[in-house]
Amino acid sequence: MPKRAIIPAGSGVPLAPFVPGTLADGVLYVSGTLPFDKDNNVVHVGDAAAQTRHVLEIIKSVIETAGGSMDDVTMNSIFITDWANYGAVNQVYAEYFPGEKPARFCIQCGLVKPDALIEIASIAHLGK
């Protein structure tokens, strides 16, 4: 099965050996996305809603670079550092998925940088 790396224009260099997305057989796998700028600095420190919006904009960019849209998302995996931010995360999340919602899960855990409050990984079905 051939696969293709999806790297939006202006993407920074990841902290580890991975690409923002991989397209294989019509399915786009979007790597865990953190609220980082292109230099891997955490943005919107202390603001879960703004970090969520930043992360979802990056994910949207990856999906659009692959030729899809947020409507193609079938699964989101959400990692948050504090359940107190769950409401703010959901409020922003709902703006990006106003129609039929994709499957998802959300867990509380530590993240790679202490100021990062959220990480999201996505799967989108773009067809063949």
Swiss-Prot record:
One GO cellular component term noted in the UniProt record for this chain: cytosol
Pfam families linked to this entry: Ribonuc_L-PSP
EC number in record: 3.5.-.-
Membrane-spanning residues: none
Ribosomal protein keyword on record: no
Enzyme class of the recorded protein, top EC level: hydrolase
Chemical reaction(s) catalysed: (Z)-3-aminoacrylate + H2O + H(+) = 3-oxopropanoate + NH4(+)
A GO molecular-function descriptor: deaminase activity
UniProt keyword annotations, A-Z: Hydrolase
Xref: NCBIfam families: RutC
HAMAP family recorded: RutC
PANTHER family named among the record's database cross-references: 2-IMINOBUTANOATE/2-IMINOPROPANOATE DEAMINASE RIDA, PROTEIN HMF1-RELATED
Protein name: 3-aminoacrylate deaminase RutC
The organism of origin for this protein: Pantoea ananatis (strain LMG 20103)
Gene encoding the protein: rutC
